[in-house]
């Protein structure tokens, strides 16, 4: 949801753009832009996309504790299918879809957009299935413009995800550094992701395009602890614990 807020903020600065926010929940900040609907409600989507020129598809089931796991596929794949059908019914031919680097799987060293998909969990597999659906769609809809964005872990205003929890642990002093701290964490700031989506809308108007998004450099855990302490002017303990001890929690 923080992505939606930042994208709306960014797009409202672009001349000659009128926004419609379609969401399952009413927006506290943008109620005047919001229409309530679910990507699983194809009929409602067809109704709301009348007169629309471009769709940014952010809707996704993404939390780690989703049950049943079939919800990943219901929302992420069937939701994509409903969106495409609603777009086609209304003559909408431009789509920006936020996928994920999760399609590459674990422990890949800076994979390019051409790297083979190797998702390791249901979230990643469902995102890849949604991309495959888009590829098949584009094969028979060559006049469309489809831009796929694969961001890494996103952090920023309004976010209470993994990066937020990590930084909160570091700030609290309860963070235990397991190993030598040289493992790296790739991240993307939500404001930068929103700006890149705006760039795609304004500049990538033809063809089928795929983009990874990561804000470089990747920080080591040692870097993160240092920078958090530096920003807060606070000493953060940096005792390192061996991996075998960390395995016991």
Question: Residue locations for each model-derived region?
Answer:
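NAD(P)H-binding glycine-rich loop region in Rossmannoid oxidoreductase-like domains
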Residues: 39-78, 82, 86, 104
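Flexible, glycine-rich beta-alpha linker
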Residues: 104-105, 144-165
């Amino acid at each position: 949801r923080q992505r939606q807020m930042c994208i709306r903020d960014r797009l409202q600065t672009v001349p000659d753009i009128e926004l419609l926010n379609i969401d399952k929940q009413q927006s506290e900040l943008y109620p005047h832009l919001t229409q309530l609907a679910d990507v699983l409600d194809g009929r409602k989507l067809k109704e709301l996309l009348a007169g629309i020129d471009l769709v940014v598809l952010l809707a996704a089931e993404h939390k780690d504790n989703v049950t049943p796991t079939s919800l990943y596929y219901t929302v992420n794949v069937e939701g994509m299918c409903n969106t495409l059908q609603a777009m086609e019914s209304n003559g909408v031919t431009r789509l920006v879809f936020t996928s994920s680097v999760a399609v590459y799987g674990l422990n890949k060293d800076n994979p390019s957009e051409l790297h083979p998909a190797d998702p390791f969990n249901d979230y990643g597999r469902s995102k890849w299935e949604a991309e495959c659906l888009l590829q098949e769609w584009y094969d028979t809809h060559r006049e469309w413009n489809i831009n796929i964005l694969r961001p890494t872990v996103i952090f920023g205003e309004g976010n209470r995800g993994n990066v937020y929890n990590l930084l909160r642990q570091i700030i609290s002093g309860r963070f235990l550094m397991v190993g030598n701290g040289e493992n790296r964490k790739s991240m993307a700031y939500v404001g930068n992701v929103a700006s890149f989506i705006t760039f795609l809308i304004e500049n990538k108007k033809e063809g089928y395009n795929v983009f990874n998004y990561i804000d470089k450099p990747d920080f080591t855990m040692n870097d993160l602890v240092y920078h958090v302490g530096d920003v807060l002017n606070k000493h953060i303990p940096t005792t390192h614990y061996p991996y075998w001890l960390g395995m016991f929690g």
